[in-house]
Amino acid sequence: MPLMVVGTSSHVGKSTMVAAICRCLVRRGIRVAPFKSQNMSLNSFVTADGGEIGIAQAMQAWAARLSPTIDMNPVLLKPKGDCTSQVVLLGHPYKDVPIAEYYMETPYLLTEALAAYGRLVEEYGEVVVEGAGGAAEVNLYDRDIANTLLAEKLGIPLILVADIERGGVFAQVYGTIKLLPAPLRPLVKGIIINKFRGDPAIFANGIRIIEELTGVTVLGVVPHFSLPLPSEDSLSIGDKRHRDLPVRIAVIRLPHISNFTDFELLEQYAAVEYVPCGGSLAGYDCIIIPGTKNTIEDLAALREAGTDREILSAREQGIPVIGICGGYQMLGATLIDDGFESAAGEYPGLGLLDCSTRFATYSKNTMQVKRLAAPVSPILVSMGEVTGYEIHMGVTDPGTDQEAFSGDGRVTADGLVFGTYMHGLFLNPSAADALLAYLYAKKELTYSPIQTGAADPYDLLAGLFEEHVDMEAIVALLEK
């Protein structure tokens, strides 16, 4: 029988717990797939067949040793601002909807989500479902297709995850269970306390109290830990702490920043800081303009804050400037919107590249890619072949600059400004090495290349989970 992991709130660790359970089951020889009916995130991933899903479900698929598919996250909401989100349905753009209108769509979306869930059950047998946000959002019970409505339809065991680091864990757990609709309360079969710091023995009486209050077994207390797993959403940026390393990289924290998981390998070898629009860019060795859900609006915000002048000043000082996806579009001369990405009009770009971009349709390019870096730059020259994925609206006229990658991107004559549509570029060790080696050498510092073949983080996660959680009790839930 499948099971469902729900939370007392957002950011309690549901995604990671699902990934841990998936890897633990796979290591026992049990085939399992992850599923989240509805996710809201600007960090997304492109499946092999060109569908877009949340990065968390891709991560969970990897934990289950599967290739991600669109059925694992049939509904993805990508916030655009002004209480409006783009709805991605079964991997492809469905429509932009205000929140009030979205709830009119939930019966149809739930039907599609249940069909996707059914296909996963048919193929894999076992499915670990992840809820969204807090399970006890009482004002949404009649339309919450990620928690209550879904749980009522599926009727499968629920495991509740709570974050003790925030404080108030007793109220979190007790309140969530008591506020669940009466038919769902008996489905709560276990509780996991996550992000514990210190000696767990101190919390032994806390476990007893929670079990007495709720009548539900505490399956385990998971310590606070750090593993190189992809971040799910913008809440995670606030948790990032840059390392005290000699090379500093500024990633512009655009208002609608997306796919900042692109830089998580760099974070291990450089002081990567997410600098908000208006923040100082002085003293950085490299500036990266990342992807964004709203290129034109974020370019306007960047300009209003004066960050455009800081970027242009850094360029004059010989600081590398790199644009990824929407950041690549911003680096160009012009952006023309026919009313599909933002308000219709023509907007000047930063002018660091000669390219120009037009948003002429609502369609989106989504595909996995393999590219060869052009040996025309002191940074690109040693990258070689790299892989990644594209998720973007708009078509770019490349202009007169040199090609940066085979079939993608542009680079200036001196090689210090380049843009690409390729998300995941710097998750390639060769690409991260190429950039870091250049930056370290420029400061006359020795750089040691990234060592590949390190321990699988999902196995490390599973080992930690097994150490602190009663995994046999979870397996028993599946067997009922």
From Swiss-Prot:
Protein's UniProt keywords contain Cell cycle: no
Boundaries of every GATase cobBQ-type domain copy: 246-431
A Pfam family per the record: GATase_3
UniProt entry tagged with the keyword rRNA-binding: no
CDD domains found in the cross-reference section: CobQ_N, GATase1_CobQ
Pathway participation: Cofactor biosynthesis; adenosylcobalamin biosynthesis
One term of GO molecular function: catalytic activity
Active site positions, chain numbering: C325, H423
Keywords: Cobalamin biosynthesis, Glutamine amidotransferase
Superkingdom in the source lineage: Archaea
PROSITE patterns in alphabetical order: GATASE_COBBQ (PS51274)
InterPro entries hit by this protein: Class_I_gatase-like, CobQ/CobB/MinD/ParA_Nub-bd_dom, CobQ_GATase1, CobQ_N, CobQ_synth, GATase_3, P-loop_NTPase
UniProt GO BP: cobalamin biosynthetic process
NCBIfam families named among the record's database cross-references: cobQ, PRK00784.1
Family as reported in the entry's similarity comment: Belongs to the CobB/CobQ family. CobQ subfamily.
UniProt function note: Catalyzes amidations at positions B, D, E, and G on adenosylcobyrinic A,C-diamide. NH(2) groups are provided by glutamine, and one molecule of ATP is hydrogenolyzed for each amidation.
Protein name (record): Probable cobyric acid synthase
Phylogenetic lineage: Archaea, Methanobacteriati, Methanobacteriota, Stenosarchaea group, Methanomicrobia
